[in-house]
């Protein structure tokens, strides 16, 4: 895992087309902005896991299946 330190307003690049910018920090929360091509899916981890479990037919925690 690559660990980086960024300040508000600073950006990191993932490949040539994806940027992640730190928009703000408030307490233990960090607001980030992700700029990626339309064909690149960007999800929060818990949403991604739900999508994957729905694809495989495995109920997710708290799901109503």
Curated annotation (Swiss-Prot):
Keywords: Activator, Cytoplasm, Repressor, RNA-binding, Translation regulation. InterPro entries: CsrA, CsrA_sf. One of its GO terms (molecular function) is mRNA 5'-UTR binding. GO terms for cellular component: cytosol. One of its GO terms (biological process) is mRNA catabolic process. Pfam families: CsrA (PF02599). Its main location: cytoplasm. It is found in: Cytoplasm. The keyword Cytoplasm applies. Homodimer; the beta-strands of each monomer intercalate to form a hydrophobic core, while the alpha-helices form wings that extend away from the core. Belongs to the CsrA/RsmA family. NCBIfam families: csrA, PRK01712.1. PANTHER family: CARBON STORAGE REGULATOR. A key translational regulator that binds mRNA to regulate translation initiation and/or mRNA stability. Mediates global changes in gene expression, shifting from rapid growth to stress survival by linking envelope stress, the stringent response and the catabolite repression systems. Usually binds in the 5'-UTR; binding at or near the Shine-Dalgarno sequence prevents ribosome-binding, repressing translation, binding elsewhere in the 5'-UTR can activate translation and/or stabilize the mRNA. Its function is antagonized by small RNA(s). This is Translational regulator CsrA. The lineage of its organism: Bacteria, Pseudomonadati, Pseudomonadota, Gammaproteobacteria, Alteromonadales. The gene is csrA.
């Amino acid at each position: 895992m690559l660990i980086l330190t960024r300040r508000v307003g600073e950006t990191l690049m993932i490949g040539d087309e994806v940027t992640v910018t730190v928009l703000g920090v408030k307490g233990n929360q960090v607001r980030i902005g992700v700029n990626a091509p339309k064909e690149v899916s960007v999800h929060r981890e818990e949403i991604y896991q739900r999508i994957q479990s729905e694809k495989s037919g495995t109920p997710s925690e708290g799901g109503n299946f």
